[in-house]
Structures are given as structure tokens and as C-alpha cells.
């Protein structure tokens, strides 16, 4: 299942037991967040996970930011 055409996230029970991954890869989206949390730059993440494009990573982060803004507005 693709989350949205605009968001490059895929969830498929056959891929990493259904973990959210970057579309077209087996890289979990959580890997991006985990790496950023410990101080890895976006450039380093892309270098370490070459199947994920910069555009994909940025679009996912923008989606999360938008979702947080929506939650804030709803509160």
C-alpha cells in the first residue's frame, strides 16, 4: 500500500513485515528519523542509504512536518 502518490512511503506486509519503507527500497522510514536523531546529516543518510533519494527523504520530512502542523491546528 502506498500512503499517497505525493509521499514516497510504502507499506507492504511482504516487505520488512509491513514496516513503512521508502518507495522502491527496503529502507525503513524510521531509519531516517533514527539517523537524524543521533546527529547524522541528511547528506550522510543519503550516502549511507543510496537507494533513497534526497527528494524522497525531503518529501517524507515535509509530510511529517505538515502532519504535526495539522495536529497543532486541531488542538
Where are the model-predicted features located?
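Long, charge-rich, low-complexity alpha-helical segments
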Residues: 28-75
